[in-house]
Amino acid sequence: MPRGDFVDPPPVNWDLVKDEALWKILSGAAERQIDCKNADRFEVSVDFLLQQVAWLTERHASQVRAQVRKATAAVRNSGPSPVPSGEPAGSGHQRAHSALSFRRDSPRNEAGSGTGTPLHSSMRPLVARNTSTNTTVLRDMTGAPASPRPGVGLASRAGDRRRLSSLPITSVPDKSLEQTAQPELSPEERSPSPGPAEDSSPTSSDDESIPAQSRIIRRPPRYQPPDGGQYEDDDDDESEPAFQPYTSPSSKTSAQDLGSTLRGDKPVSGKRPHKSHGKPAIHKSNTSDSSASSAAIIQKPDKTDRSTEQRTPGPLSPHRPAELTGRSPGGKDKGYSREGSEGTPSMGSSYSDLDDASVTQSALEEALASHMNSRGAGSRFSISQAFRSRYTSSSNQ
């Protein structure tokens, strides 16, 4: 590296003794002026001397700042309140003492301040806890003053209303007063108190609160329609369970309805018969299912038309079960599959399979499904049994 005409400065002879001597001169500068001739004895250049003076001054200032921080931290730890570094410690202690005395002397019965439990319910006796001793005291709202706890300060504001609700339950006029005062209670008063002091007297509080709770929780009766009311079809579908046969009070008409359902008779009118007894008919159908249905199967309707009697299911012919099994899902290998007829034909299917019975099979199923939906009577018999009876009756004709 070319240095040109630069010449190295002479080596400096400096040690700790010269540092202490220089610091003594700097520390006494407040009392008297510094003599410039004293710098000659250090035998250093002026630039180095000024640099050393600045370093010593900065070191002293950093030490002073560290001592101030330590003193401030010690005062904060010892005193109850933080004391600023510029103020004396005595005034800080005096202000902290006044704040503590103000907190001790000020009453804390506001509604917002309070770590106490919420207000007790009006249907239970007020349980007050003495702060000095850990015992619980039961106080009646009519005769005793308010609880000393800070959270129950609002009990005195609603005194009349609370007293009416806490009167004895046995007397008749008191019950009327309680019933008039109960709708005015707020939701907080209705909810039972979660405080731990209620567990001390479970028997007395529960015995007194049971009738009151039964009155408060009692719901208004639901709307009950008249006995002879007419229901729409939608209401019948919602009120009746699914797949439950309709049973009228008379056994004769129920026998005719169920018999016509098995034989596939068309309904007399487009609308389903209305209920005559409302909801009791549902309970009757639940209890008398087996008896009514068995009676319906045994009895024969008193009709002059003999064509309906010929439709009653008789014994199956020996050829018909083979055809039925051929059309069942288990007999798909014989070529009677419906999926093959709808889509691509199966291996054994031909035009000879499409006889009258197989052509009318889908029409019979659709008619039976629509008939059962309109009548709402598909409980005891499955669709396969009903279809089998319909199919055999039509084939016997």
Curated annotation (Swiss-Prot):
Function: Plays a role in autophagy. Functions at the preautophagosomal structure (PAS) in order to form normal autophagosomes under starvation conditions. Also plays a role in mitophagy. Autophagy is required for proper vegetative growth, asexual/sexual reproduction, and full virulence. Autophagy is particularly involved in the biosynthesis of deoxynivalenol (DON), an important virulence determinant.
Region Disordered: start-end pairs: 71-397
Gene Ontology CC entries for this record: phagophore assembly site
Superkingdom as given in the UniProt entry: Eukaryota
UniProt entry keywords in alphabetical sequence: Autophagy, Protein transport, Transport
Family of the protein in this entry: Belongs to the ATG29 family.
Knockout-associated phenotype: Significantly decreases the radial growth of colonies under nutrient-rich conditions.
Start-end of Polar residues biased regions: 245-259, 343-363, 381-397
The organism of origin for this protein: Gibberella zeae (strain ATCC MYA-4620 / CBS 123657 / FGSC 9075 / NRRL 31084 / PH-1) (Wheat head blight fungus)
Subunit structure: Forms a stable complex with ATG17 and ATG31. Interacts directly with ATG31. The ATG17-ATG29-ATG31 complex interacts with the ATG1-ATG13 complex. Note=The interaction with the ATG1-ATG13 complex is induced by starvation.
Biased composition (Acidic residues): 230-240
Name the UniProt record assigns to this protein: Autophagy-related protein 29
Pfam short name (any one): ATG29_N
Composition bias type Basic residues, residue spans: 269-282
Cell compartments where the protein resides: Preautophagosomal structure
Residue ranges, compositional bias (Basic and acidic residues): 300-309, 330-341
Record GO biological process: autophagosome assembly; protein transport
Principal location listed in the UniProt entry: other
